[in-house]
């Protein structure tokens, strides 16, 4: 059927574009593939000489959750906050880039030695990226705006700016300004998450770890504790990565005008492993709260 449709379109001066399942067929070289089931279909297509639009659902779908599901309107499932989208490599032309993408697609560390990537001859076949929105759980225009903005700005920038020239903290500063501008224009943009993300990189043979705290808000007053207590306005103010002993419990929260915003985040620094943010939530929307936005 796919080959019949492709032949019909070609006879009428048209080019077929289809989801990556079409790679199972004997396609003409003129067909274009949309890679939505991760990145592997796009990598295969580009290396086989087909034009590709990169649109991995695990990263570039706007109908996925963008913050703690219990604080958000019901969505399709999954988790794609703005930083996750911003870190995507549209042209995974090295093992390291492909592994970075695969790690956030799978929600776990993936070694560069275990992934396919786009070879030199295939890079020019990646013609763009696409963010997708499916509306099973989106009932109003305002809800649609809430799901798309400001994540659409991250997708736009990753499309025209190489990954090595993108810097999260610079983008974070700018995106907070743009959220205010969107609201001023009557667009119901998501105001960005108040959650604090804690990551830990093990040092000294597992005896210590470098801890990083991050939030989407800017400027941000993030306070933390290392003694098991909840952060309060007088707790240590985060001003950059710090080192702790393995076995330490880090608790952190965002504060605005002396009050905690959002919820407290907690991480036990395990001596056996790094703790990275791979943006994982269960893909079961029925367990999540459904609230109006």
Give the positions of each predicted feature:
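Active-site neighborhood of glycoside hydrolase catalytic domains
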Residues: 1-50
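Hydrophobic, well-ordered secondary-structure elements that form the walls
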Residues: 9, 33, 152, 224, ...
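Acidic/polar loop patches that form or flank catalytic/metal-binding clefts of enzymes
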Residues: 10-20, 52-56, 162-168, 190-191, ...
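Generic beta-strand/beta-sheet core signal
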Residues: 17-21, 34-36, 53-55, 132, ...
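Active-site clefts of carbohydrate-active enzymes
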Residues: 20-30, 61-65, 86-92, 128-135
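Histidine/acidic-residue-rich catalytic or RNA/ligand-binding cores of hydrolases
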Residues: 27, 63-71, 141-145
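Substrate-binding clefts and catalytic carboxylate motifs of secreted carbohydrate-active enzymes
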Residues: 72-207, 216-220
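Short, compositionally stereotyped local motifs that mark structural "simplifiers"
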Residues: 166-293
């Amino acid at each position: 059927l796919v080959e019949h449709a492709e032949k019909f379109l070609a006879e009428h001066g048209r080019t077929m574009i289809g989801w990556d399942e079409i790679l199972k067929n004997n396609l003409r070289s003129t067909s274009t593939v949309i890679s939505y089931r991760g990145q592997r279909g796009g990598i295969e297509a580009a290396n086989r000489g087909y034009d590709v639009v990169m649109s991995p659902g695990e990263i570039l779908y706007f109908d996925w959750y963008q913050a703690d599901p219990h604080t958000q309107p019901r969505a399709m499932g999954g988790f794609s906050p703005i930083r996750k989208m911003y870190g995507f490599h549209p042209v995974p032309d090295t093992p390291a880039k492909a592994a970075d993408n695969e790690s956030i697609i799978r929600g776990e560390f993936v070694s560069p030695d275990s992934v396919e990537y786009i070879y030199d001859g295939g890079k020019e076949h990646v013609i763009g990226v696409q963010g997708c929105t499916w509306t099973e759980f989106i009932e109003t225009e305002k809800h649609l705006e809430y799901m798309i903005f400001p994540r659409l700005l991250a997708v736009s920038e990753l499309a025209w700016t190489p990954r090595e020239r993108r810097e999260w903290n610079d983008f974070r500063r700018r995106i907070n300004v743009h959220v205010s501008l969107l609201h001023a224009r009557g667009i119901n943009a998501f105001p960005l998450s108040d959650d604090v993300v804690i990551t830990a990189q093990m040092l000294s043979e597992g005896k210590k770890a470098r801890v990083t705290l991050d939030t989407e808000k800017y400027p941000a007053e993030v306070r933390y504790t290392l003694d098991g207590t909840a952060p309060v306005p007088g707790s240590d103010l985060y001003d950059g990565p710090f080192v702790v002993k393995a076995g330490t419990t880090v608790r952190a929260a965002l504060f605005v005008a002396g009050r905690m915003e959002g919820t407290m985040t907690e991480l036990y620094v395990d001596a056996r492993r790094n703790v990275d943010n791979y943006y994982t939530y269960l893909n079961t929307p029925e367990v999540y709260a459904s609230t109006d936005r």
